Regions:
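Flavin (primarily FAD) cofactor-binding/catalytic cores of flavoenzymes
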Residues: 2-13, 18-37, 41-43, 72-369
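A short acidic, helix-capping loop that chelates divalent metal ions and anchors anionic groups
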Residues: 66-72
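A short small-residue
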Residues: 62-66, 326-328
Length: 369
């Protein structure tokens, strides 16, 4: 198998991969973005039909290009996908589509990236696949009555997929709440999960827009390298069972006749059982239970017991030249959001530039000796 040599390989062509590519291109670095999809934004296009971003356009630009919509507009999933395509084209970011990486290893002074019959050797690798690669449902989902229609939120598209009858949505975060409103006109919807709270006010107001920008700028600057930033991220991680509702409020759910119920505890005789002991008779279940890490293809000892990368602001200190981006609370409260992609991408690109200079200096020293 022939091995291609590239200075830097970015694995993943979502918003974090593109933001990283932007800064690498500013350095005029030799790099390539590998993406398993056939075009930019596919992970957005494949979500449910009515999906809009949970934050407005004014807070969702990537470095070098604002989102082309009124600042208070909540972009649709297709608008977000189109933005990513336009962004990559504007900055002429080098990408190879349809490349699913099977294995990442380290050999001698290089990382080896294997994708089918293709293999690349790189001095730097940025894993930009994020942390949420695999849809997760509890094991007892398989115990539900076979007649119960089940979808994970990643597979849900619109109400026409579901049977007549009641719907239980498991997970009361932003996705669960949005899907509940999508289904409420045609079904009795029960939304299971703890109240995650919500961001009060209206994004349409000037004051709220200004407040959102102030929060975003503070969140970007209060990284884990600051005392207050470390405290905020520690608190957020401890609470990381659900994000505050942004576009949807409890009032919206009440007005749509969505019934809030406790968390799901298990299954009894094929029926879902709530924490308060109630057994539900529903025809459909939508799992808005999120995703889990899937880094099994990375054959390197860089993970903790829970399978999370061990890093500082995305830099893996035990494997020089390896980086992660898009992880929850990677450096700040907004690291896994579109709005936070730029600051983490710049930090990593700057680290790559610094390491490249160091490697070049060492090489020159070796040749001179």
């Amino acid at each position: 198998m022939k091995t291609e040599r590239i200075n830097t390989v970015v694995i993943g062509g979502g918003q974090t991969g593109l933001a990283t590519g932007y800064y690498l291109s500013q350095q005029k670095r030799d790099f390539v973005i590998l993406d398993a999809q056939e075009r930019f934004g596919e992970s957005w296009r494949k979500r449910w039909d009515s999906l809009r971003l949970f934050t407005p356009a004014g807070l969702n630009g990537l470095p070098g290009m604002t989102f082309p919509a009124p600042s208070e507009h909540f972009p649709t999933k297709d608008e977000m996908a189109g933005y990513l395509e336009t962004y990559a084209a504007r900055f002429e970011l080098p990408v190879r589509f349809g490349v699913r990486v099977d294995e990442l290893t380290h050999e001698d002074e290089h990382y080896l990236i294997t994708a089918g019959l293709q293999r690349s050797a790189a001095e730097h690798v940025v894993v930009a696949t994020g942390a949420y690669a695999t849809p997760w449902v509890p094991a007892f989902a398989g115990e539900l009555d076979p007649a119960t229609t089940q979808y994970h939120s990643v597979s849900y598209r619109n109400p026409s997929q579901l049977r007549r009858g009641d719907v239980l949505i498991v997970g009361a975060g932003n996705s669960g709440a949005e899907i509940a409103l999508d289904l409420a006109p045609n079904h009795q919807v029960l939304l299971a999960g703890r109240d995650t709270g919500h961001v009060p006010g209206s994004f349409g107001s000037f004051g709220y827009q200004a407040g959102g920008r102030v929060f975003l700028e503070l969140a970007k600057r209060l990284t884990i390298d600051t005392l207050l930033g470390r405290w905020l991220v520690t608190k957020a991680r401890a609470f990381h069972g659900g994000h505050l509702l942004v576009r949807v409020s409890p009032k919206d759910l009440t007005e749509a006749d969505v019934q809030r119920v406790p968390r799901l505890a298990g299954v009894r005789d094929g029926q879902p059982v709530l924490e308060d002991g109630r057994v539900l008779d529903v025809s459909n279940v939508v799992w808005a239970t999120g995703f889990r890490n899937d880094f099994r293809w990375i054959r390197l000892p860089v993970f903790d017991a829970q399978g999370n990368p061990i890093h500082h602001r995305g830099v893996v200190e035990t494997e020089p030249g390896l980086y992660f981006i898009g992880l929850p609370f990677q450096s700040s409260l907004v690291s896994s959001q579109v709005a936070g992609a730029g600051i983490d991408a710049k930090y990593i690109a700057d680290h790559i530039a610094s390491r490249a200079r160091e490697l070049s200096f060492r090489l020159k020293e070796g040749l001179a000796s």
